[in-house]
């Protein structure tokens, strides 16, 4: 076989320098993998699928009714302030939460039981090391006869132990949301101090108290059930809404900057 000039040169170099072998195969580039956010979304979906929840995707561009009015949020509520909400028109927004899926799911199913997990992008006019103008949330909704707070506690504990680890527990702390009554903030025991609030006699630098805030939850407000076409005298339910980025950072002990999750730093992203 006749060799090209370049091939002859490579072979000549090989003879002159025994440490150089042009016939050795090159290094194969590493394979890619799911981004940490995509991984987290997949994990959340599978955890709730085990409980019978069905994954839904509802609009990111939403009307005022599904975004606010139908969820018991009046026109003068601070959450409606255009300093936080992206208004495209007077009655059309980039939804700031995944709770818009509640009414849409009620209208779609019509007759309970309803078990929905709505995972999607949300938008708010905020930007800092702990907040981003675009982030992901997941909204859970369960409606049936005789649903009560103990069912909510069971679901939150199941999620916490499935995602964060079997030793983690949750607690409900009274709060206020327009679309749930009663309403709670869900806290999860801190993994760093094992829920004690202290390490070597000093306050835990992560939680300071033994607990970390997971997100909001509560029993669906009767008026919201009515707005969705569900009889509140016959059915009850609970809902919860938590951040994908937040739980990912909590699981992987990322305490510095939310924006790192959307960086192009391969060394950082390849850890997950």
Regions found by a protein language model. Name each.
Residues 1-272:
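TRNA-recognition modules of translation machinery and tRNA-sensing kinases, especially anticodon-binding
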